[in-house]
Amino acid sequence: MKLVTLKDGSRDGMLAVVARDLKTAHLADGIAPTMQRALDDWNFIAPQLEELSLQLGSGRARRPFEFVPANCMAPLPRAHQWLDGSVYEQHVELLTRAFSGKLPDNLWREPMMYQGGSDDFLGPGDAAIFAEEHWGIDFEPELGVVLGDTPMQVRRDDALDHVRLLVLVNDWSLRNLIAAELGKSFGFLQSKPATGFAPLAITPDEIGEAWSGGLAHLGVAVDWNGVRFMAANAGVGTRFTFAELIAHAARTRNLRAGTIIGSGTVSSGGNVGCIAELRAREALDAADEKGKPGKARTDYMKYGDRVRIEAFDGGGSTVFGAIDQQVTSLRRRRAPGAGADEPEIAMPAALAFAQADTATSDTAAADALAQDAGTSAASALRAAIAEQVATGSAIADARADGPDALPPQAG
């Protein structure tokens, strides 16, 4: 099944199920209000979500509405844990050779992994906001797994049993801050800003045999400012699988439901996955007679640049929807009259969506918007769905209809 989190003005959004053709969606609030709630009680909740997905696909769902990716947050807008590996041989070896010169003997003895920030994930169309352009802004296309509760010391052979969902990731990196941080031998912090996600989180069965051996054998494509930068198979060129990453992360700790583990930058078959790889190749190609790397030609991203990351199945269909983000200056995002350290707070997309047509014939929805400012964003999304009812594109809001209109619960 395909799951998303819709913007409603809250931190965690509202869980919804999306049809396999990506044309319609259905709120899952009668089953689980948020993605994290579903993950917390997966064995009970997942069958109910699957039944709702089947109803949506067969036309039997009671309250479908048009699926609009722009209304999505990250599938998990904030997670208990974000752990990122680096399993692609080409990515690691290119960067190591260009910037360190020598590959250490123990490079592939065990997986590499860092713990990143997980409290402020970016949705698929959210601006990627940075304070300084000269920090070396770079994208990194990755695949990830979302886990259920995973015990400490889980065996590699059992690790994949704890995978609940697959996701597509843009692990933003600030390359010019990395060397100083790693030089302190204390890991990444400032060089790893908020991570972006595609709208859909999917169960592994959605890609069939492409989920094999602990890897997702999907095509991953990156466009930078509308020009194809990379297209590669995410299932080849790896030294480790997700099973090994999970077992590595759980060696000394439990991994709680909602933990996300990333693959590291997809890079294979000579297709560089990020700007740093391209620069590394340029530097190595310009090496002097002693083998010292020369100067790279390609600059990192600038304000106004845009990156689009998407994964495709064997038939060419999008799997997770697209990440489509624009690099934006923090200074340009400040609201007029705001204090020097106060970033602009944008209107929730759901609220803007709901207010796009104020001439609603659904007076109950309009009254709800007017009367309850404390929950205006959530009411707005519901009013928008109710507005679609008036034009024949959806069915009325469950909460307005009463408990009988809630989705049937399996079991």
Task: Annotate each PLM feature.
Residues 1-12, 20-21, 29, 33-232, ...:
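Active-site microenvironments in enzyme catalytic cores
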Residues 8, 12-13, 175-354, 408-411:
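Catalytic-pocket segment enriched in acidic/His residues
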Residues 16:
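Short beta-strand-centered aromatic/proline hotspots
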Residues 270-271, 356, 364, 379-382, ...:
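Intrinsically disordered, low-complexity serine/threonine-rich segments
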Residues 349-368:
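Long, compositionally biased low-complexity repeat segments characteristic
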Residues 368-411:
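Long, low-complexity, intrinsically disordered segments
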